Structures are given as structure tokens and as C-alpha cells.
């Protein structure tokens, strides 16, 4: 890549990674509602007596069955209650970082007394959360839309305190840069950008490794990571690099989905996507004992490639986005093992031929299953590419060009899978109570 082109794309690409790779405590969909409630509580100025919340169907899907960190409970009602009673309105995706046991008890009491209600709000916006808090004769409403922390409305007693213009940033979509760059340029940029400008990505390894260690220390969620490690000890699984990738990555997801009070470094608004883009690269880099520079460039490539692919998808969809985030770590591993774009291209094409169509049926402990499947596919696909074999453009939705293959996958997710999404949500909200 020539210096002029590097300079042209450097600022927007760095901005995107800094914007989309951020710490998040807890699954980001219920956290978005918690942030709306915390902000409403700030403007209410007193302890709320009742909470009425509304969320988009996709946010409901991702909030029904997932643990809310620090509470020992799952679901959107507890997220709204603890956000209102103990959330930090300035904390963004770490809104619940400083909650106390007393506040958790108060939040649970609100639920027991049926003072918190969460309904589906039919809206054209895939990501939408709204919290309305009541106390005495006061009422505060806060709405978040399109991005997990994008507050668009604050209203108190019917008067608008803050309202973001809907077209405020219509002409400055930060993802527009991806209309001008290719996957090859993503690779070349990651290899050539000044190292000091991407050192911040090392924090992703630190945060998600800590989460992985926590997931191996205690039984969280389905404790898949611990189970696989146990079976390595019993001899039923090999103690090899693939097993290490699956165990350490899945353990981080176990802890995250099981309610651990440690932040994940997220990607594209998702902690699991951040984990899938980080941990396989960390494990392989440690195994190879590579230099700090190579490690950082591999991590940066992984996260940027994951953002690049996810930018072509709806913010929330019926396609499990851990699969696309794992395509990022596939690129990072390919860089570590060969340093060649051709390996990256063959690897991602094979992944698309392998795990396309895994559905998102809501955030839950079972997300860790999809994480283990996706990262295993990524490593397998790199090994195939190193042996000059891959799913070719003669097969299925894969084409001879990586960017066209990515576009095909994302087109299916954006169009055809919309009907799947509706049916998944219908099934989830109509299940009988156990």
C-alpha cells in the first residue's frame, strides 16, 4: 500500500476501531436498557416508584435469557431496575460497574412487587430501548436508538430536555469508509500502520484474557471451557492448539454470559464478538511466542476485519454475529502463521462455506456454544489454506473474490433471514413458563 493511500484511510479506520472496540460489562442489549433507565433516574432526581420500558423485537430477543452482571438474575426487567437504582449514567456500556448488593436487593423488590414492566415496541429501528421512570407526580422518559449508547431523547413531565436530530449524522456515517476499501486493503493497512497508533488494541487481550481466566476459575453459564479442559485431562480431548483456542475463548464467553462482573472488550457492540475476535489470536500468538508488534498487528487486523464484515449486517439480525467476528480472528491467525493475504482470503471463504446461517436465537449461555463452533472453524480454515485448499468460488455462496463472498453472506442475513428473525422472536416470546 502506497503512503498516500495509507494516509487517506488511516484516520477513519483508526476512528472506527477506537469507536467499536470498547469495554462492556454484561450483554450489551440489556445494558442498553439499563443505561436508558440510569439516565432517566438522573433526571428524575429521586428513587423511582415504577418503571415502564419498551424495546425493539431484536433487543427483546437478546435480553430475555441472558444474565445481568452482579444481580444473579436474567432478563430485561432486572436490567431496567438495577440500571435505575444503581446505574452510572455516564458509564455507557459499563453502566452497572459500581452497583451494590443493597441496590440489587432493592431492584429485586421492585420486580417482586410488579413495579417493572417491559414490552415489545414495534419499530423500524432494529435496536431501540426506552425507559420511563415514575416517582410522585414526576415522569422521565429516555430513549436509545440504533447504537447501544445513542441517547436520542430525554423528556421530563412531557417537556423535551434533550433530543438528537434524526438526520444529525445522516451524512457522516463512519462506516462509509468501507465502501471505499477492500478486505485486502484492511489487511495491508493493519500490516503497515504505525505501531504506536494501534497499541491501544492490546487492552482487548488484557480484558478478555482476564475474563477467560475467570471462566476457567468458576462454573459460569454452561461452563463449556471448563468442561473441555476437564476432558483434555481425562484424555478424551487432545492437548493441542485447537483445544486451547476453543477452551480459552469459550471460557471467556461462559463468564460473560454467566454474569461475571468483569468487562469484556467488545466489538461492534457485542462482548462475545469482541471475545471471538480476540482470544483465538491471543492463544496462537502466545503459542508461537511472537513479537509484541506481530501480536498487536494480528489483534488489530482481527478486530478491524470483524468490524468491516459486521458493518454490512443489520446491527442485530438473525445471523449469529459471533460467526463473522470469528472471521476476524481467522484473519489474525492467518497473519500470524503466514503473513499472507491469500491465506486470509482462503480462510474466510472456507468459513463462509462452513458456518453460514447459524442463527441468533437471543443472547444466552448457549452463545458460548456458537463461540466454540465458530473459532474452531476459523482455525480449521487457516490450516486448510496453509495446505492450499479452501471452499472455492464454484461452491454455494462462495465466489472467487473475498469481498463478493462477504457481500453474499451479509445480503442473505440482511434480506432473507429477516423472516427467520421474526419467527425466532415469536417462538421465544410465546414459550410456556417452565
Language-model features and meaning:
Residues 4-5, 25-28, 58-62, 145-162, ...:
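A structural signal for small-residue-enriched, beta-sheet-centric alpha/beta enzyme cores
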Residues 34-130:
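Early transmembrane hairpin of solute transport permeases
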Residues 47-51, 91-96, 118-119, 195-201, ...:
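Flexible, glycine/charged-enriched surface loops at secondary-structure junctions
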Residues 23-39, 262-279, 320-324:
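Conserved phosphate/anionic-ligand binding catalytic regions in large, soluble enzymes, centered on
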Residues 13-23, 58-66, 255-266, 306-316, ...:
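Glycine/charged-rich beta-loop-alpha catalytic/anionic-binding loops adjacent to active sites
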Residues 40-43, 284-297, 301, 307-373, ...:
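Hydrophobic alpha-helical bundle architecture
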Residues 112-259, 426-434:
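Signature of multi-pass transmembrane helix bundles
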Residues 2-14, 45-59, 240-259, 291-309, ...:
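Acidic-glycine-rich active-site phosphate/pyrophosphate-binding loop
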